[in-house]
Design a protein with these regions (language model features):
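An alpha-beta-alpha
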Residues: 73, 165-208, 306-328
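Flexible loop/hinge segments that line or gate small-molecule binding clefts
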Residues: 135-159, 270-278
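Hydrophobic alpha-helical segments within soluble ligand-binding/sensing domains
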Residues: 158-181, 283-302
Length: 353
């Protein structure tokens, strides 16, 4: 009987202990539910944006325009290491078309993708394929060196005008040609932006100039051996050469380093005064800075300016005199700068009408 009493007493204590524990559990659970109800729902993780750059065929390594674009990409990547960037350097326009069309055909996804067509050569290709294939909502395009405006708000264009800077190059050339004619060397006769540079130089020079084209297509940008060969004749005939031919310019600069009897020259796209003592100055494009700013705006806002023209007064284009010639030519360049800006504006106003 005694043992049973002890047993019943222990059971009673156990029941009371369980009841107390259950009450504590229910209170804790209720408190937890209230706590979670007060907390905001976590935002879904945003997919990592992707950026694709399609360079001009054979363009990378030109120590000029394309390498300056690459520098801008690197500037952006330094502070945005989480963004996926893919770079294509095709060998031909046919390969470029395949890369671009394959991308356009990809199905819609939740990943934002920007495709940068980093050459004016791609404008006809873009027009052809975009007339047949619509962009899915997650896709955007940035077309370099184009003033075309598209109805699709996800297609953006820009052009850095070379007119004003080339006008100042022409002013400089007029002072150092030494009584000889000047020569404008262009990669081809179909690329709009380089024809703008030609027109600016001719207007600044103010006299008749000869014009030569290295090719009738994009290969004029990658024909350095041909340009080097032609310098044998050009060096005898001309007092100043204004070359707008991308990587082909390296053949001209190489000749001027190897032969003393070389004409004065202009550098192109970046400061190239270190490549030859005959380079009086360079038509520069600060496209590295511009591209970095465009990419930053896109990843933060999802958009960019639709169509923009950047001229001499924007700071993205300029005529940069080589240090060895600055004292001699800076007064004339400074005096002509305001005229160059006004002429550039008139040039585009006329083209718009």
């Amino acid at each position: 009987m005694f043992s049973k009493t002890i047993s019943l007493f222990n059971i009673s204590n156990a029941i009371r202990a369980c009841a107390a524990a259950l009450a504590l559990f229910i209170a804790a659970a209720a408190s937890s539910c209230l706590s979670h109800r007060d907390e905001p729902e976590p935002e879904p993780e945003r997919p990592t944006p992707q950026i694709i750059f399609l360079f001009s065929p054979g363009g990378l390594g030109d120590m000029s325009y394309n390498d300056c674009i690459l520098k801008g990409i690197q500037l952006f990547k330094n502070d945005n290491s989480d963004i996926d960037i893919y770079i294509y350097s095709p060998n031909s326009l046919e390969e470029s078309e395949r890369i671009f069309s394959d991308w356009l055909k990809r199905p819609e996804s939740n990943i934002p993708v920007l495709f940068a067509l980093a050459s004016s050569d791609y404008e006809p290709m873009a027009e052809e394929y975009l007339s047949e294939l619509a962009l899915t909502p997650n896709k955007s395009i940035l077309l370099f060196e184009s003033l075309k405006e598209y109805a699709d708000p996800n297609i953006h264009t820009f052009q850095i005008s070379m007119y004003g800077a080339s006008y100042l190059a022409g002013v400089t050339a007029a002072q150092c040609a030494g009584g000889k004619k000047s020569l404008v060397v262009l990669a081809n006769n179909s690329d709009g932006p380089i024809s703008v540079a030609r027109d600016g130089f001719l207007d600044g020079y103010g006299s008749e100039c000869d014009i030569e084209y290295l090719a009738d297509d994009w290969t004029g940008y990658v024909s350095a051996p041909l340009a080097y060969q032609k310098m044998n004749t050009w060096a005898q005939e001309y007092g100043f050469i204004f070359p707008v031919a991308g990587g082909s310019n390296s053949g001209i600069y190489r000749y001027s380093r190897e032969f003393d009897a070389s004409p004065f020259l202009a550098g192109m796209d970046i400061d190239q005064s270190s490549l030859s003592t005959r380079i009086t100055g360079s038509v520069i494009k600060n496209i590295d800075v511009l591209i970095c700013q465009y990419l930053l705006e896109w990843i933060h806002t999802g958009t960019m300016p639709e169509s923009q023209l950047y001229g001499l007064d924007s700071g993205y284009a300029d005529w940069f005199l080589a240090p060895r010639y600055k004292e001699e030519f800076q007064p004339a360049v400074t005096e002509a700068r305001r005229v160059a800006i006004e002429k550039e504006k008139e040039y585009y106003d006329t083209k718009a009408h």
